[in-house]
Amino acid sequence: MKKIAFGCDHVGFILKHEIVAHLVERGVEVIDKGTWSSERTDYPHYASQVALAVAGGEVDGGILICGTGVGISIAANKFAGIRAVVCSEPYSAQLSRQHNDTNVLAFGSRVVGLELAKMIVDAWLGAQYEGGRHQQRVEAITAIEQRRN
């Protein structure tokens, strides 16, 4: 992924800056969807901004941070075409791309520290969707999404 939308709430604000710097060092273009301060805010807004950018093709994928990664990933998954995963270790991040074709990664700043967050991001960005036997399952998820909408 060459272009990423990034969003967080106030809890993820400090970690976001560190991860954005890490991404830029790797040559990834980052579109910052907020928040831009540590003042209290609500994560659904930032999940929405990132999900819309991903679903609309503005970016290749998205990264979200809140306290645990759970709430912000739930909000992102409400958008058609979004397959957001919350990860607290690199192996799940890698497999989520390889097997589930995830396009949004979420994690919690209260759960992972900076070095682990970098490892999770690197594993996710470094993995490619394998298709094959996994394609049928991804298509089944998309069919559920289409029936719901």
Swiss-Prot record:
Pathway this chain belongs to: Carbohydrate degradation; pentose phosphate pathway; D-ribose 5-phosphate from D-ribulose 5-phosphate (non-oxidative stage): step 1/1
EC number: 5.3.1.6
Key words, A-Z: Carbohydrate metabolism, Isomerase
Regulation: Inhibited by iodoacetate and glucose 6-phosphate.
Dependence of activity on temperature: After incubation at 45 degrees Celsius for 30 minutes RpiB retains 65% of its original activities. At 60 degrees Celsius RpiB is rapidly inactivated.
Catalytic residues (UniProt): 66, 99
Catalysed reaction, written as an equation: aldehydo-D-ribose 5-phosphate = D-ribulose 5-phosphate; D-allose 6-phosphate = D-allulose 6-phosphate
Keyword Transmembrane helix (UniProt): no
Signal sequence segment: none
Positions contributing to D-ribulose 5-phosphate binding: 9-10, 67-71, 100, 110, 133, 137
One Pfam short name: LacAB_rpiB
Single GO MF annotation: ribose-5-phosphate isomerase activity
Gene Ontology biological-process annotations: D-allose catabolic process; pentose-phosphate shunt, non-oxidative branch
The keyword Isomerase appears for this protein: yes
Induction, as annotated: Induced by ribose and repressed by RpiR.
Superkingdom, natural source: Bacteria
Family the entry assigns: Belongs to the LacAB/RpiB family.
Subunit structure, as described in the record: Homodimer, and homotetramer.
Described function: Catalyzes the interconversion of ribulose-5-P and ribose-5-P. It probably also has activity on D-allose 6-phosphate.
Protein name: Ribose-5-phosphate isomerase B
Organism the protein comes from: Escherichia coli (strain K12)
